[in-house]
């Protein structure tokens, strides 16, 4: 079995790659930093005795050329899943951000993820026990001044996964979407953690593996964010507008 992990060289993606390799799955791991990706691939191959193909690809620009991924699949076991722990933010991401930064955020967090799905969807729909797993953010629950484009992209991605799950009903393909709170990665570095401490990525990676074929649709990690998802949208504007950080 082979899984494609987009964003697999650091943070959550790296933890997921480690977990899936430890369970004897072949991998294609993709990131923008080939040196780091090669190092991760080499370590996993030596440690777990599986095939791991490292590929370099920038998600910030479109169109995307996926021929190299297709060619890598020809030399591996059958494709079983597409896992997309992609996340990119910018400390200057506020309304009015420059066009270049805006499109980099939009393409990385939404457009490129959808293009990956569109490309491999016909294959995954035909094979048994396959999965597509996406990752959103609690930043998308209610937009604020900071992370404006990032949050909008993640909200759009959540909607896309809802449509995708509806589209593949009665097929062998499982579609899952994780709404992620603060976890211990570079995306949470520097964030205000007074109330919420970062959760561990290794634990989440284990949850992703163990539940990869469950048809739950959308879930939250940590679980308490489900309550916040319900409550935050109904906070009065007179109160919410004061949450600037």
What are these model-predicted stretches?
Residues 117, 153:
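Active-site helix of classical SDR
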Residues 23-40:
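Conserved glycine-rich Rossmann-like NAD(P)H-binding loop of the short-chain dehydrogenase/reductase
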Residues 9-10:
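Conserved glycine-rich cofactor-binding loop
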Residues 85-91:
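Conserved NAD(P)H cofactor-binding loop of Rossmann-fold oxidoreductase domains
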Residues 137:
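Residue(s) in the substrate-gating loop at a strand-loop-helix junction
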Residues 177-178, 193-228:
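C-terminal helical subdomain
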Residues 93-106:
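Substrate-binding pocket helix/loop in short-chain dehydrogenase/reductase
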């Amino acid at each position: 079995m082979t899984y494609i992990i987009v964003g697999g060289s650091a943070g959550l993606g790296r933890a997921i790659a480690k977990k899936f390799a430890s369970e004897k799955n072949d991998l294609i791991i993709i990131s923008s930093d080939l040196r780091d990706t090669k190092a991760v691939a080499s370590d996993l191959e030596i440690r777990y005795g599986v095939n791991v193909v490292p590929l370099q690809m920038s998600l910030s620009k479109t169109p995307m050329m996926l021929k190299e991924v297709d060619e890598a699949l020809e030399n591996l076991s059958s494709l079983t899943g597409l896992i997309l722990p992609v996340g990119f933010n910018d400390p200057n991401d506020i309304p009015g951000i420059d066009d270049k930064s805006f499109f980099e955020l939009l393409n990385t967090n939404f457009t490129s993820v959808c293009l990956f799905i569109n490309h491999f969807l016909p294959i995954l729909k035909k094979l048994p026990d396959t999965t597509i797993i996406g990752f959103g953010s609690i930043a998308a629950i209610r937009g604020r001044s900071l992370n404006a484009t990032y949050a909008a992209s993640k909200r759009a991605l959540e909607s896309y996964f809802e449509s995708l799950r509806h589209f593949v009903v009665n097929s062998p393909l499982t579609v899952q979407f994780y709404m992620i709170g603060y976890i211990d990665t570079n995306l949470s570095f520097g964030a205000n953690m007074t109330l919420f401490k970062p959760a561990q990525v290794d634990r989440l990676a284990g949850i992703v593996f163990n539940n990869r074929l469950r048809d739950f649709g959308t879930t939250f990690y940590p679980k308490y964010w489900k309550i916040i998802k319900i409550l935050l949208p109904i906070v009065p504007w007179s109160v919410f507008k004061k949450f600037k950080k």
